[in-house]
Structure formats: structure tokens, C-alpha cells
């Protein structure tokens, strides 16, 4: 069996396994609560949806497991809960539990981040701007501008983002398929030879521009930046590593803005507790996903994610065609 066939079978098996696990988990949760009654209290958090602690934990798992894999966490946080009958948790809940993912990035890349901070300070003091740390810091800063600009623009122009076309299942499916094809093209055309130590600040701007596409659910922030990194010939693991660092400002800003918006609504304890559970769950599973992906990409290609995204998009379109989710 060829590596590509193996990747396809692995992606297909993963898709089926995830669907079965979610289906079984939902069936168990409905038939017989796993948590004590006092632990499944619900509170309206965002988008008019009540989320209990079990659901918050599962949503945190989905966020953590998919945020740093090039398969779109936003798409899965929209599609999976709807498939389970929970409803769309909304932009606010999704953005807040992403703070757990950012905590995982700080946890995993603490030495890199402190090195970048020290490098920037030293470069400013000595006026020598050719160090890798300064280039990384500058690249992250410049690369954050596009997504912040277009994110603010979208917030101004789209009044009800939760129920807009941008968060529709059809948009998610099409975006997933298109990005799968682009990732496949990047795998084919990229040389995958440029190491992390050869990163330039211009790479941050290029990958940051690609990151802005992730405002469309289904595109995937890590997927778009990883794809851009492969197109500019970075090693797979190097592209992933910089992608994670690049996402820190954007995800943090989005999470804090939505958190402030929720806190301004004077949420009850029943609503705050699921946010805490979801964020902690997201942090733990994000850390595991980061560690796994970097190790995986040191030896393997991204074809498994190409096939997964194709299958994911086709399954959603098929389900919509059969009348589900409408």
C-alpha cells in the first residue's frame, strides 16, 4: 500500500471514528448523565445556546484537538455540535475557549517566546536587527496586522456574524475542500527544505496575510498559514512551529474581546462555569495536539489532512443535500 493510500485510509478511519465517538457520547449523555446533576447545570453563554459542563468539556476537546491541526477548529465547533443536536455555540464561546489554546502555546513555546522578547530588546538596544529572534518578532507583529484589520472590518460590516452566510455549513464545507486542494498543491510544489533558522520577517507577512483567510470558518488558521509556509519552501515542522507563534496575538485579541463582551452581560455562575471548563479542556488538548503535530511533521507529510478535509467537506455537503442541518 502506497503512503498516499495509507494517508487516505487513515483520514477516512479518523473521520468515521470521530463521528462514532461523538454519536455514542451524545447518546450516553442523553440517556444517562455522566456527571452529577449539579455538574450539568446550564447557562446561556452566546447565540442563545445553553451549554452544560459535559458539552463544554467536549467542545474544549474539539477546540484543542483541531485548533493547531490544519483542519479548522471553527468548522468543527460549528458542525459537530449541530450534528449532535446541541446547536451552534456561537462566535463568543468559540473565541473565549481559544484562550486555552493560547495558554498551551505559551506553555509549549515558552523558551521560544522569551528568546524572541530578549532578542527584540537586544536588537533595539544595540541597533543590530539581523538576529533570528528580532526577525521572528517583527514577522509575528507584521503578520498580525491583516487578520486584525479584516477582522474589525468584518465585525463592522456583518451585524449578526453567528447567523451569517460566513458561518453557514455550506461555506464551511466549500472552504474545507478548497483549502484541502491548496494544501495538496503546496505539498506538491514546495521544496520543504528551508529550516526554522532561515525564517525572514517577510515570511511572517506572507503567512499573516494567509492567516486572515481564517476569518472564514472552514479555512483553518493553522491550515492557511501552514499552506503558505509550504508554498515558500519551509520545512513542514518549521512552518507549523512559526504558524503556532504567529497565531498568538490574533487569537488572544479575539478571545479577550469576546470575553469582555460576555462579562459585560453579567453572566450567571451557571454560564461562567462552562466557559472555565471549556477553556481548561481546550488548553490540555491543545498542548497534546501541538506536541503531536510537530513530531508528526518532522517525518511525515500533510496528505492525511488533505484527505481528511476533502472527506469532511464532502460529508457536510452530502448531509445538507439530504436535508440535514437545514
Swiss-Prot record:
- Looking at the UniProt entry, the stretches that span the membrane are 11-31, 42-62, 90-110, 138-158, 165-185, 212-232, 242-262, 272-292, 304-324
A Gene Ontology cellular-component term = plasma membrane
Q: What class of enzyme is it?
A: hydrolase
Protein keywords: Antibiotic resistance, Cell inner membrane, Cell membrane, Cell shape, Cell wall biogenesis/degradation, Hydrolase, Membrane, Peptidoglycan synthesis, Transmembrane, Transmembrane helix
Task: Return the NCBIfam families for the record.
Answer: PRK00281.2-5, undec_PP_bacA
Q: Which HAMAP family match?
A: Undec_diphosphatase
Q: What is this protein called?
A: Undecaprenyl-diphosphatase
Organism of provenance: Synechocystis sp. (strain ATCC 27184 / PCC 6803 / Kazusa)
